[in-house]
């Protein structure tokens, strides 16, 4: 699957014939943010600041001490910092790490794409084995950024099932990093919005579309990788992406709409529709 004017890139190292991102000394491929991301981010930050101000005022009213009042939001930030640190520690302690000697073909893909996106530092990459989650993830702690790949991307023999699909999913997560979605202060500044039903989720969906824009800008031929989220590594080749994308337009119902408004990731049908028709932005709300 390729868009109009898509760049033809050299073969991905280790995968003859597959696309990869431009080298670090070449022009960085631009990718637009979803138009709803910036306004939703502003609203979410505003809501968080209002909640923080209300909390500070409540503590000051109860204690009469500005020291205690200031300590509460500082404690929230400190706890969140520690939670991120523990999540990162869990990956380091339990997960398989992609390296030049361990899944080297995946490592080369990550390095190439990170350079093409202009990242000054290549994120660490881990493989999540088992569990119910088929999605890949991007996160961070301190100055470190890391990606988590699902074992659904690998076959029983340990080889990558589909190099182009993996490259697209890696580019999606690197897009989160390039767009600043994994930063500590950005996440802290929007914590309050997560307490408002639908608000934090709407920002999260917009960020997912932004990450897809990055992935499509670098690996347009791998956009069919969205089928893996729907069918997993074993069934995705049998999924008709066009049929699923059409359902984003034809499926109706209040419960379905409510679901789309509350989830943090775009539904598979809406995401596939956005990837198939690049003339339209992904649907965040209606």
What does each model-identified segment do?
Residues 173-190, 220-223:
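Catalytic Zn2+-binding segment of zinc metalloproteases
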Residues 152-168:
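Short pre-active-site segment immediately N-terminal to the catalytic Zn-binding motif
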Residues 96, 155-156, 192-203:
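Short helix/strand-bridging catalytic loops that position acidic/His residues to coordinate divalent metals
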Residues 157, 170-178, 210, 214:
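Active-site His/Glu-centered metal-binding helix of metallohydrolases
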Residues 129-146:
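Catalytic zinc-binding patch centered on the HExxH motif and its immediate surroundings
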Residues 249-286:
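Pan-zinc metallopeptidase signature
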